[in-house]
Amino acid sequence: MSFVTTRPDSIGETAANLHEIGVTMSAHDDGVTPLITNVESPAHDLVSIVTSMLFSMHGELYKAIARQAHVIHESFVQTLQTSKTSYWLTELANRAGTST
């Protein structure tokens, strides 16, 4: 019979690293949001005004997508953290079962 083992500690380290990446990405998104959602018109002609409005709308779309991505990212991190605990408990149960 073959056995599969995991390293729950490495799963936990991966979850922690991914969490830090998410924090960094969110901080970056928060920093650029005013710049990409309030694009100033370079001139007062109609084309410049419409173009700046278009860029601002794209900025709002980016902000909405970034929020959704953050929720998905945090859900993935939470899944990894839960998996770490599950794998750890399974490994303990397997060790207890094979040592008797």
UniProtKB/Swiss-Prot annotation:
A Pfam family recorded for this sequence: PE
Catalytic function, reaction form: an acetyl ester + H2O = an aliphatic alcohol + acetate + H(+); a butanoate ester + H2O = an aliphatic alcohol + butanoate + H(+); an octanoate ester + H2O = an aliphatic alcohol + octanoate + H(+)
InterPro entries assigned: PE-PGRS_N
Disruption phenotype: Knock-down of the gene alters the colony morphology and slows down growth. Knock-down induces aggregation, early biofilm formation and changes in cell wall lipid composition. It also results in decreased survival of Mycobacterium inside macrophages and reduced necrotic death of THP-1 macrophages.
Example GO molecular function: acetylesterase activity
Enzyme Commission number(s) of this protein: 3.1.1.6
Keywords tagged on the record: Cell wall, Cell wall biogenesis/degradation, Hydrolase, Secreted, Virulence
Assigned GO CC terms: extracellular region
Signal peptide: none
Upregulating conditions: Coexpressed with PPE17.
Protein family membership: Belongs to the mycobacterial PE family.
Protein name (record): Esterase PE11
Chain's gene name: PE11
